Amino acid sequence: MLKVIDHPLIKQKLSVIRSQKAGHDVFRKNVIEIASLMTYEVFRNYKLKEIKIDTPVAQDVLAYDYDKEIVIVAILRAGLAMVPGIVNLLPKARVGHIGIFRDEKTFEPNNYFYKIPDVPKDSEILIVDPMLATGNSAVYAIERLKKDGFKNIRLLSLVGVQEGVDNIEKNVGKDFPIFLGSLDEKLNDKKYIVPGLGDAGDRIFGTK
């Protein structure tokens, strides 16, 4: 279930990081800001529980708090850059990590690290990765989390292509929630998104 978050601030900031002139400092800053902006829409339907609090002038006032644990799962390494923008709005959220690298010949995912907080299986899980290209890494992450018993899982990426969306819908289900800032045109022969962002990990961390 694809949702492209159409917002002028997201469009403008995506334009900044699409430019090859953007250095790693500018790129990283805008990735954080875009992730923060997109968080509003991702958690639009998140259910809160009612609590009672005392204000400076009243007692037993109706208020709201988290109903379920929230876990942000960053796909390493590029997904790390999105975490600060999200936890800035969700400070109680826990953070997990899945290390995946793509084989440059087969384009298949290889897992080298997996660490998820010990939380109830009905927790809200948000996988974050700036790019949804082939979708193979996302499918691996989703299936690994489902194997561990998690059910409430969604994916947040800055940009993606239909091929990646189709891969998830085919292997996970058409109702799986996917949130993108932009649905780009296609993948090139090296499986890079076009027009895309280039190698998001290298651009975030200033490496090549």
From Swiss-Prot:
Pathway: Pyrimidine metabolism; UMP biosynthesis via salvage pathway; UMP from uracil: step 1/1. 5-phospho-alpha-D-ribose 1-diphosphate binds at residues 77, 102, 129-137, 199. The keyword Glycosyltransferase applies. Its EC number is 2.4.2.9. CDD domains: PRTases_typeI. One of its GO terms (biological process) is UMP salvage. Allosterically activated by GTP. Belongs to the UPRTase family. PANTHER family: ADENINE PHOSPHORIBOSYLTRANSFERASE (PTHR32315), URACIL PHOSPHORIBOSYLTRANSFERASE, CHLOROPLASTIC (PTHR32315:SF4). This is Uracil phosphoribosyltransferase. It comes from Mycoplasmopsis pulmonis (strain UAB CTIP) (Mycoplasma pulmonis). The lineage of its organism: Bacteria, Bacillati, Mycoplasmatota, Mycoplasmoidales, Metamycoplasmataceae.
